[in-house]
């Protein structure tokens, strides 16, 4: 099924989730995916994407590191995706900017359930000095919006 043109009726789901998908899609496609996600979400539903962090939230070194991967690993949409402002794309798809969310969470597989649960419970992973940083271990950048 094409994520830009879903076959589901309006207001079908409480959650729309993707994992490491959007950076494989051109910008115009991402805008359509977000609009479709909003369409199929029920009121109060959540659109959430686990993805690469945006360049605006990376140190110059970390941005260079990911840019290198984009240019030399056959990833044509990787850098353009990271140049986007996720909150702006959500807004353009019709999501309320006040309902935008972003988190950096540790990988449950790397750190274990206890550390993961503590990070989720704290709900402070949006701190700008943590968001998008490439650190020891595996951490995932997540963003989205409530409908």
Where are these regions (language model features)?
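Active-site proximal loops enriched in glycine and acidic residues that flank catalytic Cys/His/Asp
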Residues: 2, 17-20, 51, 102-104
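A short acidic, Gly/Pro-enriched loop at the edge of an enzyme's catalytic core
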Residues: 4-16
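A short glycine-rich, Lys/Arg-flanked "PGG" loop and its adjoining helix->strand segment in the class I
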Residues: 31-43
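Core SAM-dependent methyltransferase catalytic element
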Residues: 91-147
